[in-house]
């Protein structure tokens, strides 16, 4: 049993191996046959092209050589023989190299001249027997329409010229007419195919021009882009304004009590430098901080040619006025000061502290006397060019500062129960400001009345 099974296994293995070898051998043979066929076809094609080209060149050279007598007859016979060989071995147009590559070609008269692709296709068409034997390709309607317009009588001159100048057409005409085709069919097929060839050339030329135009349009116009770039106006950098810088400058100028100052330019014209409208100060307020309205001054725009920001040193009289007003307001609003929380001083508390240090030297009585005198003087002189003066203090909480100085104010009081509103008319404010600039002294009674 075991020996029978082993023999069966070896037999099946040998059969499988033989079958595999047979299949591989068959594939290899087919591959070799295909390669040999392709190689033979290429060799035949190249040989035919070489023979045709050589025959044409030899024929051309023999035609150019001048001879006489028997030598001329021999050379003429050889030339005719080579011409027949060239026509026989010349491949058809669909099996030749692209006709666009041909730049030199022998003419029917025996000369060589540079020809374009259209003339090369025309000569190939003339030497092809299928041009005259086979029916034209394409729809029959086109052929019938063309035949209705074609007249063989009008082409007699051209036919005679072709028979005289083209040996290939003359040889084919002699062989085919009237054995294979009639005279009219021969020339109708020839002229129709020439007509189709001309249409193809026109179509090819149109496509070529369209491609050239599209390539030309896709090229970037660097000159136009450069002109557009040069024609662009630059950004008006001189008119650029920075709102954040203006707000910071206006806040610092208002806190210092800035007043419009008059300067003289190089040309001698006087112009005023005014702070812009006071914007809300950016800072880190404390937990119980509230808004504090400061003094804003707006001059007459018609009398000021140039308005600029100024953050430098301001007159001391104007700064003292704002500081004294803030100090008086804070003293009235904070009868019961409360110690601030350590480590959280606010920006609004530090600025009034500086003001309170200066007012502590002068004293409240001097402030009151100056305010009274200023009010009386301005009532007589009338309003000046200052138009708006506001002092709204709805939250002015003052407490002793961390260093214990008198009059320092903070905004962290929590038990403030009373709001202090100071309402003044526009005329009273203008009179008070003008009086401070003129006299600089106020009385106690007028200060109390003014409050």
From Swiss-Prot:
Record-annotated BSD domain positions: 146-198
The organism's place on the tree of life at top rank: Eukaryota
Acidic residues composition bias: residue spans: 412-424
Disordered: annotated span: 252-296, 309-424
Record field: compositional bias (Polar residues): 309-320, 392-411
Positions with biased composition (Basic and acidic residues): 365-388
InterPro entries xref list: BSD_dom, BSD_dom_sf, BSD_domain-containing
GO CC annotations, alphabetized: cytoplasm
Pfam families, per the entry: BSD
Compositionally biased region (Low complexity): 275-295
PANTHER family membership: BSD DOMAIN-CONTAINING PROTEIN 1, SYNAPSE-ASSOCIATED PROTEIN
Protein name: BSD domain-containing protein 1
Organism: Gallus gallus
């Amino acid at each position: 049993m075991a020996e029978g099974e082993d023999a069966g296994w070896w037999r099946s293995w040998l059969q499988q191996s033989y079958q595999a070898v047979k299949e591989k051998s068959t594939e290899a043979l087919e591959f070799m046959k295909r390669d040999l066929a392709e190689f033979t076809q290429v060799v035949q094609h190249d040989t035919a092209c070489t023979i045709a080209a050589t025959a044409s060149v030899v024929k051309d050279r023999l035609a150019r050589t001048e001879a006489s007598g028997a030598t001329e007859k021999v050379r003429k016979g050889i030339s005719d023989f080579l011409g027949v060989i060239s026509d026989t071995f010349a491949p058809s147009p669909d099996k030749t190299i692209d006709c666009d590559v041909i730049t030199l070609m022998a003419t029917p008269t025996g000369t060589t001249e540079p020809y374009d692709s259209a003339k090369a296709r025309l000569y190939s068409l003339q030497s092809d027997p299928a041009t005259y034997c086979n029916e034209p390709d394409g729809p029959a309607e086109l052929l019938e329409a063309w035949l209705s317009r074609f007249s063989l009588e009008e082409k007699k001159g051209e036919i005679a010229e072709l028979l005289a100048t083209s040996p290939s057409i003359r040889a084919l005409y002699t062989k085919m007419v009237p054995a294979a085709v009639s005279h009219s069919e021969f020339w109708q097929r020839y002229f129709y195919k020439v007509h189709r060839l001309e249409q193809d050339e026109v179509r090819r030329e149109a496509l070529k021009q369209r491609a050239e135009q599209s390539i030309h349009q896709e090229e970037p116009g660097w000159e136009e882009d450069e002109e557009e770039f040069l024609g662009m106006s630059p950004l008006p950098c001189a008119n650029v304004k920075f709102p954040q810088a203006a707000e910071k400058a206006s806040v610092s100028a208002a806190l210092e009590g800035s007043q419009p100052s008059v300067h003289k330019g190089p040309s001698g014209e006087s112009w005023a430098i005014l702070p812009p409208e006071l914007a809300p100060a950016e800072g880190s307020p404390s937990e119980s901080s509230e808004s504090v309205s400061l003094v804003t001054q707006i001059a007459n725009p018609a009398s000021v040619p140039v308005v600029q920001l100024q953050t430098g040193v301001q007159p001391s009289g104007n700064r003292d006025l704002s500081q004294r007003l803030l100090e008086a307001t804070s003293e009235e609003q904070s009868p019961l000061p409360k110690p601030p929380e350590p480590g959280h001083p606010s920006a609004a508390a530090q600025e009034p502290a500086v003001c309170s240090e200066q007012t502590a030297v002068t004293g409240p009585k001097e402030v009151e006397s100056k305010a009274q005198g200023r009010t009386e003087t301005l009532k007589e002189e009338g309003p000046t060019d200052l138009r708006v003066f506001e002092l709204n203090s709805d939250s002015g909480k003052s407490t002793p500062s961390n260093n214990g100085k008198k009059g320092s104010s903070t905004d962290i009081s929590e038990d403030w129960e009373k709001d202090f509103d100071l309402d003044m008319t526009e005329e009273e404010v203008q009179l008070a400001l003008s009086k401070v600039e003129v006299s600089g002294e106020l009385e106690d009674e007028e200060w109390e009345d003014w409050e």
